[in-house]
Design a protein with these regions (language model features):
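Glycine-rich, charged/polar anion/phosphate-binding loops
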Residues: 1-2, 83-86, 113
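Glycine/small-residue-rich phosphate/adenosyl-binding loop
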Residues: 1-52
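Short secondary-structure boundary segments
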Residues: 19, 75, 103
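Short, hinge-like loop/turn segments at secondary-structure boundaries
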Residues: 33-34, 88-91
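GST superfamily/GST-like fold recognition
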Residues: 46-47, 66-82
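Alpha-helical transmembrane segments of helical membrane proteins, especially in multi-pass transport
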Residues: 54-56
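Hydrophobic pocket-lining residues that define ligand/cofactor binding sites across diverse proteins
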Residues: 60-63
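C-terminal helix-cap and adjacent tail motif
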Residues: 96-135
Length: 135
């Protein structure tokens, strides 16, 4: 087992962010939001997942700001049933991944493909004014 995985297995904190589509649709059907139905068609993307992802990012950022180590990782689909059963998670709540938080280990460098692959340039990922527009 690699050092990083061993460290994640003993992290003192594991957070599993859960998205709940029903809670999201219910909230936006309340009078102060202006809609009275739960029509999913109003959403161009599943914002219940997007908002959960943004909350996850804030958890990661806060952990790092506090000098801790943190890592987001996906939960393999074949393990979600066991996770639900172990923690009594209702079927309408969807885990979007997991976060481990602990004291950061010494970083020996990344041996994986990310270390060998060059980062894309800003011109490759940022478009100004229109797709392909340079800045």
């Amino acid at each position: 087992m690699s050092d990083w995985l061993g460290g994640m297995r003993i992290a003192p904190v594991v957070i599993v962010p859960l998205a709940c589509k029903g809670a999201y649709l219910d909230r936006y059907a309340e009078p102060d939001k202006g809609w009275t139905d739960r029509d999913e068609g109003r959403w161009p993307a599943p914002y219940w997942h997007i908002d959960t992802g943004m909350a996850t990012l804030l958890i990661l950022q806060t952990a790092v700001d506090e000098g801790l180590g943190a890592c987001f990782f996906g939960i393999p689909p074949e393990r979600i049933g066991g996770f639900r059963e172990a923690f009594g998670v209702p079927s309408d709540h969807t885990p979007i991944g997991a976060i481990t938080i602990g004291h950061r280990a010494q970083d020996p460098g990344t041996p994986g493909s990310a270390a060998r692959r060059a980062r894309r340039t800003a011109d490759e990922v940022v478009h100004r004014g229109r797709w392909g527009g340079k800045g």
